[in-house]
Amino acid sequence: MDRVVLPFKPRFIVYYCGSNDVNGKEGATGIVERITQFNDRVHAVLPQTRVFFVAIQRAPDKRARWAVVDSVNATLKATAARSSYITYLDLNPVLFDRTGAVRSELYKPDSLHFLPPAYVEFTAIIKPALEQAWANKR
């Protein structure tokens, strides 16, 4: 963080974190703590910077760990709702169809990594949030 984020004094930080950690032994609490540390450090050093946290994805490959994913996401969503500088971006809804089935066409064969059409869907959520924040910053 000290070399790749803070020196540049960004107005906005969009980041995705915690996906690999859901397979670990520490559980949701440890993941939330590390993400919170990042957010708190950014805010302490760069109080004008907006943080956009992208929710951990409910990838089919991690189905056995969705309870951890959901717990982390719910906690971070609640944190963002109380925060003046954190925006929670949930991309999970576009990964499922109306019946709740996984949209497998968005995933590579490993059922974890995304294909280009998924990024088109993500852009439709992330871009408006950034545009709105940019307009409000001026």
Identify the role of each PLM range.
Residues M1-R138:
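Alpha-helical cap/lid subdomain in secreted, periplasmic
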